[in-house]
Amino acid sequence: EKTIADAERCMRELPDDTVAAEYLTPFSSGGVSFDVMANPKLLEEAYNLDTTLIRDLVVQLQLEYDYLIIDTTSTFSALNLSLMDLSTVIDFIGIVDFIPTIKNMKRGSDALKELGYDDNKIRYVLNRSNARTRINVKDVEAILGHQFHYVIPNDFQTAAESIKTGVPLVLSAKDTPLAKGIRTMVDTYEEDTASPQKSQEGGWLSRLFS
C-alpha cells in the first residue's frame, strides 16, 4: 500500500515525473467508489512531510477530482495552514465534553480569526453532541462567538465499528442518527459547490451520502 510519504518522497526525487493519483488506494462498496491517500506508516515520516511538496501533490489532485477531503491534525502547523489556504471549506470540529477541550476550541477559533480566514469558509461542527455532559452548548457558542453550523450525534459504537471494518458508516449504518447527521452536513456542501448539471447527474459524493 502506497502512502502520502511515498508520494512526497517521489515528488522530492522526481518532481517532474510524480503523478499524485498513482499513490491513491481505490475503495469500492455498495456502488460507491472513491480513492484514498493513506497516512504515513511511520511516525517520523508524518513529522517530516515537506509542506511545499504536499501542497504540490494536493494541487495535482484538485485538478483530477471534483472533491478532496483532507483530514488534518488539530494543530496550526505550516502544513495545515497551507492546506487550509487551498481549501474551499474548513470544518472546525470540536467536542464539548470537558473544560480543556472548550479552551482549545476557543484558541483555535481565535487563531482562525487572527489568520484572516473568511467566516464563510469556516464551518463550526459539534461532534458527539449528545455525549453525557453538563456543559450547555449555548454557553460554548457564546464563548466561541459562533453558532455551530452542524451538530453530529454521539454514537461511539457505530463509529468504532466503521473504523474496525474500514467501511464508511454512511454506507454500513446509513439509517443511524450519526450517518444522517453527516449526510445532512455534506448535502449543504454539494448545494454550495455543485453546478446544476452536476447536481442532476449525481456524482460519487451524492451516492455515498444518499
Predicted regions and their residues:
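Phosphate-binding loop that captures ATP/GTP phosphates
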Residues: 1-36, 150
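Phosphate-binding/switch loop-helix module in NTP-utilizing enzymes
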Residues: 33-80
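Inter-motif core of Ras-like GTPase G domains
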Residues: 60-63, 77-98
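G-domain G4 guanine-recognition motif of GTPases
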Residues: 95-97, 122-134, 151-158
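Conserved C-terminal guanine-recognition region of P-loop GTPase G domains, centered on the G4
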Residues: 102-121
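Beta-strand-loop-alpha "switch" segments that mediate conformational coupling across diverse proteins
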Residues: 128, 141-169, 182
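NTP-binding/hydrolysis catalytic cores, primarily Walker-type P-loop NTPases
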Residues: 164-210
